[in-house]
């Protein structure tokens, strides 16, 4: 069957087919078939679409190019698809030969579809006929999903030029567009960058001999019918919930049970989930929410609940004063996905045989690099690269690549180990002002300094604040080994360091408003301060941190009891005891320990006490693994037993005690008949 779609005065049919394949309800087809305007079976065009039971159709592209295209809409054959989220993991799983060397497969595809047909958000496709624009976009998609070979875009579409009779103007526009679509650097300066919440959908084919599809936009689960108004869109805001251990941002904290509940507004069902290694992404309608921790991971305490509000695509956090303020905590969607490196091939590096050169870069998602500065000087700088970042050395000791999470640089203070400032806002102001006047990109110079010197001066000025670097001890630092190479700086460069600090200390506000910050996936590496800001790459994150639960030492009770028996025993007599205590490592214990009758003071491992019949001394808080020696004195005229065993020396001993212990002393004294006398 067919539904009807209207384009002005022209009406065209939309396929209305129902799937016979369970779990694969979406119909994928090539709409370039009989009835298409100017259709010719001799032309090799394709115009792929997906729809659901005759719904509105959505523009689609295919990947896995060695497999079949979907059949034409007038074919007796039909291909059925399952809709999936357009995540990096799904792309990699479903693509046969993806181009993933830069780790940005999803971002590259999103960029192509944002700028390709039919979206064309930056006018790259302007002047190109629709079917030709589809051809360009499809080839750009294959470049990344299938690693298709494109060596020179100026020679692209040679076969199509003949088959489709392309004129020279169309051909030139197509080649230029293809070049811009596949090269991230070509679009880095365009006014409209890909938003952080931009999404699309993947369609997995039920028949593995046919290509999978991806849509040029996000496709709803329940699409409207042709001619129907789409359902009123409930604006939702993407938020990621991430769990960290306080003070450790090298990985996400897994295993906490969290609850997200909407307390004002509607449209969100309470969600209980476990924290994971990437964060929990949720789409939230406007309203007020509470994130609470139901169960922390072992060894951690329960975090304080976080109340936040979603309004007009903004996230507001309730602060300690009870006010809602805009959330400043924004992070990249995929944690620890950014690479950074120390460029050993930088011109001028070590050219004067001094090791003050600091050539650190982070890779932006558009393929460019930005200058970055280190933070926490005694940790590792970024891993080394000898080919300008094309290949970056892994960390052999940790057997992994060092990667970074890109976050907004609003709260640098919590990452600093030894900051000079004690106020977070002042600290951030000083860093921003150093960046105002410091080295930010290639070509920056200052006075007579080389670029390497200017860059080193900027790094040292940053260390002055982030690490409390002492500029007077650069040469004597670390047993005269010097402060991270800065001891080699000449007087002119050091003078610029002081100039930067003087500027940072004045009362004017920084010109730098925001900056990127990069947090490593290893606590052995320095975090990185960026010199650029890429807000479109960031998404709101609700970050909940768990404090490690205080370690409560395992302790034990020692109960010493006294029983006096026998026909002539004195049950009112107080018997004297001396106790010697040692820790698990054999050292004498000293301290005051609570008992059932006050406190027992132990000095150099020794204490004394008295007990009479029916009494017990219960000593609490003794460390696990301790040893004791208890000796009763002044009972030589009694038979002494300990825990039912004869103890003529009146002693009880035990080593490595790891549980509660009871030591029962019994003193017995009976009348013994004189020798030779008998009784009748």
Curated annotation (Swiss-Prot):
There is a cross-link at residue 675 (Threonyl lysine isopeptide (Thr-Lys) (interchain with K-? in major pilin subunit)). The keyword Iron does not apply. Residues 217-236 are annotated as: Disordered. This is Pilus tip adhesin Cpa. Monomer. There is a cross-link at residues 562-667 (Isoaspartyl lysine isopeptide (Lys-Asn)). There is a cross-link at residues 243-546 (Isoaspartyl lysine isopeptide (Lys-Asp)). Proteolytically processed and assembled in pili through a transpeptidation reaction catalyzed by a sortase, which leads to a covalent link between Cpa and a major pilin subunit. One of its GO terms (cellular component) is pilus. It is found in: Fimbrium. Component of the pilus tip. Can bind covalently, via its two reactive thioester bonds, to molecular targets from host cell surface and can thus mediate adhesion of the streptococcal pili to host cells. Lysine side chains or a carbohydrate with a free amine group might be candidates for Cpa binding. In vitro, can covalently bind to spermidine, but it is unlikely that spermidine is the natural target of Cpa. InterPro entries: DUF7601 (IPR055382), Ig-like_fold (IPR013783), Pilus_tip_adhesin (IPR053671), SpaA_PFL_dom_1 (IPR041033), Thioester_dom (IPR013552), TQXA_dom (IPR023849). Disulfide bonds: none annotated. Residues 676-680 form a propeptide. The keyword Lipid metabolism does not apply. There is a cross-link at residues 62-211, 374-526 (Isoglutamyl cysteine thioester (Cys-Gln)). Keywords: Fimbrium, Isopeptide bond, Thioester bond. A motif (VPPTG sorting signal) lies at residues 672-676. Residues 226-236 have a biased composition (Basic and acidic residues). Residues 253-311 form the CNA-B domain.
